[in-house]
């Protein structure tokens, strides 16, 4: 019984991640067609992209209450039905307003599903498997993104209706997930999957009893997230800091505007830009699988620090390379045609303005075409490194940590509260991306993201404890009793250096003989 419930749980969670990733990635290829079909301007394009996040923000506000009140399974079921409804609205939509409504409905459903699946799986498995199983959700997301990019490429050349097929394809995995949810027992949340080893089973039983006693004697409200009680304020700081670092390193824009970014750095057709974005999807899948295998070995903290460091380096290199390349342009959004504002060919140079170049475009492109081609592939390689670093670190590990650091009876509401910051930051980053490029150029945007990545490394080192191999009760107990250990260690190092005796000049005197 336990194994069958576990398999169904994994199936539901992974399919939820797949649909989540698909909806994140599909807009990248659909946006150029939507821009042409509906004559969308810059703000309208950003609105279609960000409508997903507006729905997600609303879900973050009420989703925690929904999960804690009605259970994880019911929440997943509701989100699945809403995704089906949103997909139908998008597939049959005939106006800009319908696109925004459909994307908002799907955004609400995706967020409820994301929170429910991560919490559900974390409560179902043993500590030794928790990192692996929760990371499976992120694997589903990356596979969904890869499928979305592939579908974008397939339907890119379908005139007029290609974007409808792109949005409608999400119905297939949603129906499969719906069937899996129906088969999942209603009381699956009360099952705990035991290891074959009897001592492990006994330990889990004891921890379950301890957890029940703890819930009876200790109840939390949302206001407790801001109090020093059981170090809840510290846990909230950890969660908020992780999601803000995750979003302000610009990863959402690499997903939402992948084709736009690749087009702007030299992939001079929609098809080539979309095909190159498939490479992002492949790298994300491979890197996430690596994180899944290493999360319970290397640990959450190590993967976050290492991945975020690599992320920062990749972003800064991309920024400098864009600045050196003649491709570093400021954008002027138009609704003439897909990516017409980014075209670098000599035939369409009238709409392109260079942020720091005043040379004639025709002569410049003829003189440096080979150099541009080299820059294009180096930048593409750096972006691949950025995508893989994110997929090893922030992508899966943020949600693993968030599912572990809060007590069970407030976990849903805490997850929801933290996700409000996650979605809010995502909304700011995504909605302002094209406008910021107009002001500081593509290189400035990536350099800014790189600085945030460096700050993220420092934050993780100072405040995040390692949680690998620990039960949820052990993590709760440790966080309730300890402060920011790594910050104290760092301060002690500086204090030792400050008060330790420095070098002293020794004067040697010679005595006359």
From Swiss-Prot:
Known InterPro entries for this protein? MFS_dom, MFS_sugar_transport-like, MFS_Sugar_Transporter, MFS_trans_sf, Sugar/inositol_transpt, Sugar_transporter_CS
Which domain of life does this protein belong to?
Eukaryota
- Residue ranges in the Extracellular topological domain are 28-46, 102-104, 152-164, 258-272, 323-376
Instruction: Give TM segment ranges.
Output: 7-27, 47-67, 81-101, 105-125, 131-151, 165-185, 237-257, 273-293, 302-322, 377-397, 423-443, 444-464
> Molecular function (GO) terms listed?
D-glucose transmembrane transporter activity
Key word Lyase present in the record?
Answer: no
The listed locations are: Endomembrane system; Cytoplasm, Perinuclear region
Broad class of where this protein is predominantly found: membrane
Reaction equation(s) it catalyzes: D-glucose(out) = D-glucose(in)
How is loss of this gene reflected in the phenotype of the organism? Morpholino knockdown of the protein causes notochord and cardiovascular abnormalities. Fishes display a reduced heart rate and blood flow, coupled with an incomplete and irregular vascular patterning.
For this entry, list what GO says about its biological process: circulatory system development; D-glucose transmembrane transport; notochord development
The family database entries (Pfam families) matched by this protein are listed as: Sugar_tr
The residues that the database entry marks as glycosylated are 270, 341
User: Can you tell me which residues bind D-glucose?
Assistant: 246-247, 399
Q: Which membrane topology term applies here?
A: Multi-pass membrane protein
So which stretches are on the Cytoplasmic side? 1-6, 68-80, 126-130, 186-236, 294-301, 398-422, 465-513
The record's similarity note reads:
Belongs to the major facilitator superfamily. Sugar transporter (TC 2.A.1.1) family. Glucose transporter subfamily.
Q: What name goes with this protein?
A: Solute carrier family 2, facilitated glucose transporter member 10
